[in-house]
Amino acid sequence: MKPLVIFEMANNHMGNISHAKSIITKYYQLTKKFKSTIDFAIKFQYRDSETFIHESVLSSNDKQVQRFKTTFFSRAEWKKIIIFSKNKFKLACTPFDEVSVTNVIKDKFDYLKIASCSATDWPLLEFLAKRIKKNKIICSLGGASRDE
């Protein structure tokens, strides 16, 4: 079994497909000569744009809310990014809600990562447990207490 190195895209794509593809291409150029000895994955984050930002702050002028809103991709845009990435990397994704879990399964990601902030989100974890059949699961526990 080869070691796995995961590149975190997060919101670094800034909601721009061309920028996302540029980042993916640069990661690929850095890694392609090591593929025989190391597995590489690119990790994305899925959030349901309809529910992730609470309606009470959705129209806020808060710069963090406004910046975050610019990072959402449509399903069609995600498909383009996945197709572009699939031949270069294994695919990993952190879903932050139930809609996103369903989309991770539909999009056939190799790995599903549970974010440390979701490590005690029991409704999300139970939703995952009932649906995940083939994905490998990675769980972050950073910041969790020993009891958690």
Regions found by a protein language model. Give the residues of each.
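Active-site-adjacent beta->alpha loops and helix N-cap segments on the catalytic face
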Residues: N16-S18, F73-W78, T102, I114-K134, ...
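Hydrophobic faces of well-ordered beta-strands that scaffold small-molecule active sites
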Residues: P3-F7, F40-F44, L91-T94, L112-I114, ...
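Alpha-helix-loop-beta-strand connector modules within alpha/beta enzyme cores
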Residues: E55-F89, E126-L141
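Catalytic domains of carbohydrate-active enzymes, especially glycoside hydrolases
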Residues: S22-Y46, D107-K108
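Glycine-rich anion/phosphate-binding loops
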Residues: M14-L30, A76-E77
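Glycine-rich, proline-tolerant flexible connector loops at the mouths of alpha/beta enzymes
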Residues: N11-G15, S36-F73, S100, S116
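Short, glycine/charge-rich beta-strand/loop segments that flank catalytic centers
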Residues: P95-T102
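Conserved, mostly hydrophobic/aromatic
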Residues: E8, Y27, V104
